[in-house]
Amino acid sequence: TTAQYDDFEVDLEFKQEANGNSGVFIRSTVDGTKVSGWQVEVAPPGNDTGGIYESYGRGWLIKPDPEKDKALKFGEWNKMKIVVQGDRVISYVNGVEMVNYADEKIGAGKGGVLLQIHDGGGIKVYWRNIVLKKL
């Protein structure tokens, strides 16, 4: 988005057909090709889908319990919901709460909502039915 969002909910569907790292940036800024902020991870099984990663900052803030990885259906359409309210971020994959995390820096963050895909590596991620709602 070009607009900045404070409190919001985003619902979407994603499907991965090849290994690779992707995600949904929240309250993030763009400078050229550099995106700074927080990413809710979208990755193959065993790679922390639903966790929160801070780009150009502290790195991983929280990863989901490995047992929750069963919610992810690689090669199929998956539903993701992200709720951002104040300093709290809650992520869901196929109805399973992956993380529920509060962080002052996220709470103070300003920026848009962006989809991420790394270049190279043959990654294939598809997105559909993206709905963003202010809270």
Task: State where each predicted segment sits.
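Carbohydrate-interacting regions of secretory-pathway proteins
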Residues: T1-L135
